[in-house]
Curated annotation (Swiss-Prot):
Functional note: A translational regulator that binds mRNA to regulate translation initiation and/or mRNA stability. Usually binds in the 5'-UTR at or near the Shine-Dalgarno sequence preventing ribosome-binding, thus repressing translation. Its main target seems to be the major flagellin gene, while its function is anatagonized by FliW.
Record-linked NCBIfam families: csrA, PRK01712.1
Protein name: Translational regulator CsrA
Protein's organism: Thermotoga maritima (strain ATCC 43589 / DSM 3109 / JCM 10099 / NBRC 100826 / MSB8)
Protein family: Belongs to the CsrA/RsmA family.
Domain of life: Bacteria
Length: 83
């Protein structure tokens, strides 16, 4: 981990197109501004972890859940005779 010290108004440049500016320091809180291209997703860590957890839950589908979805599909013929 790279650790840097910055004062209010000072910036950190990441790559060629991301700039982080220290806007305000109050007690234990630091307000920063981030300039980045629109395709770069920027999230607070707690939101990122929550999103990651929700994505993992959504990807864990049981066989019974899949069978239920298939049963509701009008084209579903049931398990094949070879299974």
């Amino acid at each position: 981990m790279l650790v840097l010290t910055r004062r209010v108004g000072e910036k950190i440049v990441i790559g060629e197109d991301i700039v982080i500016t220290v806007l305000k320091i109050e007690g234990n809180s630091v307000k920063i501004g981030i300039e980045a291209p629109k395709h770069v997703k920027i999230l607070r860590e707690e939101l990122y972890e929550e999103l990651k957890s929700e994505n993992i839950k959504a990807s864990e589908v049981s066989k019974d859940d899949l069978k239920g979805v298939l049963r509701n599909d009008k084209g579903y013929k049931g398990p094949s005779a070879s299974s």
